[in-house]
């Protein structure tokens, strides 16, 4: 007991700030020499000093100053708070066995070996020694823990009850209490400044054992001391836990997470749509989440499309066609192009019921637009939106547009289109035979050639140049084979445009030159006047052209009324020249005739321009006697012309011998000829 007190008296001397590292080294030697002499009989003194210490609280010394948490201890390891406090309850609870390690820890306050009893000097050398000694004490604690201490005692930290205070001059009576202060509750030390121990230069360790050399300078952050092997295993365990994926959630949790994800996505997109702004991608989401969102968005788009189409089908059922589908609902919807849009694409949160689906040429509905859509019924899902195929002809598209908008324009364009597309008509057998008789007059080798055409032109008194004859034959060659056969001849004689051009030319015969385009109509008109064709052929040809003229006149009136109504509705300015170009030939003929009647009618009643001109294909039934006399005179002139200019074969073709073939003595011929006016030259 006295020997121990003599060892503790130098503490009062070491409390002064002038103590240097030499005293610390000497005290360390004393500690190492006195360690084996400590016995278990000192427990009584320890208990007594502990009770006195509880009655008289002493200002905290160097250990408390060392245990103060510093900035370096916060950045460093946190191993020390879980180790040194574990040594304190061991000294208070385990009894004599724990006191065996007491002398190792209880050292004079001037020494720098004991971790709880050493002060923190103001000099830099003492600071370095303090760090080194703290590491040494931890090594000693590690050796003690290996002697049989349990992990339960090692894992109990002690609460911190006081803060570090500056050192005070201790009395000799207080110098003998370091072993008692180790057993009272001490503040939990921080991580300490031993972190910087390997980097700083420390004084040489006197009498360091091999066990202390093997101890690690830095302890792990788990309760209780660990070796390098333990730290390696802990690092491997942490790496394994970090690499292992989390356990898969339960099905109920997955459903709940999916619902929450869908609701969050809808709310986020609704907020973006309301704000009208679109930012970049919020955060990277998983691949499966993106797939689920795309699937939900596609479902919502299909339902919204079906609903809008069903509402449109109820309003206008004539524009859609009912299609029965036995497959799933998605089969009755036109397949949309599968394009992966940005997940942050802004779209309206809900589609109003009055919004019509876009036309085939417009922009499709974006797929990333989930919204509140009402469920559709099975009846609405059976309706399919009609697909309009694009038309290649602009004229057909214009015609279809006018058909939907203007009925008058529709009838007008339909009439004009049918009039243009009408190339040839289906003739009856009698009409075809009548035109065959006219074709045989040219007496060509199965076709109309230049020689036969010149002979007929000489017969009727027309003067054409060879170039004009060739031009007439080329215009009559419809199929372009270089020959004007009966088929080409029939197509020319039934052409409506050529016919009305010929009628107009006959009206304006003194003002217009000869037209090779209508030469065959001019020849036919003169032959009818001269009665050069058989009676049945004349009747069939006359009836055919009268019907054509009547149909053309009615169509001209319809065209005029339609154009007038359209002009009044759209207020189209009247342009006489443009109207003249757009008029059909029938209307132009009627307009010219009406204008001729109005000009100088009272002054010149006998003028041919004041009356309806004599058209062979339109016979008049009045003044029979005058016309009979003119017909007989015309017949004698034609007989003289044929007998002098044509051969006997051609003359016999027109006038056959005998009473039945003679036109002069036929009563029926005279009756028909009485209705035909004569054309004067």
Curated annotation (Swiss-Prot):
SMART domains: EFh. Residues 83-94, 159-173, 264-281 have a biased composition (Polar residues). Residues 1-284, 298-336, 653-681 are annotated as: Disordered. Residues 319-335 have a biased composition (Low complexity). Ca(2+) binds at residues 477, 479, 481, 483, 488. Keywords: Calcium, Metal-binding. Gene3D superfamilies: EF-hand (1.10.238.10). InterPro entries: EF-hand-dom_pair, EF_Hand_1_Ca_BS, EF_hand_dom, SPT21. Residues 464-499 form the EF-hand domain. GO terms for molecular function: calcium ion binding. Residues 1-14, 251-261, 662-671 have a biased composition (Basic and acidic residues). SUPFAM superfamilies: EF-hand. PROSITE patterns: EF_HAND_1, EF_HAND_2. Involved in the differentiation of haploid spermatids. This is Spermatogenesis-associated protein 21. It comes from Mus musculus. The lineage of its organism: Eukaryota, Metazoa, Chordata, Craniata, Vertebrata. The gene is Spata21.
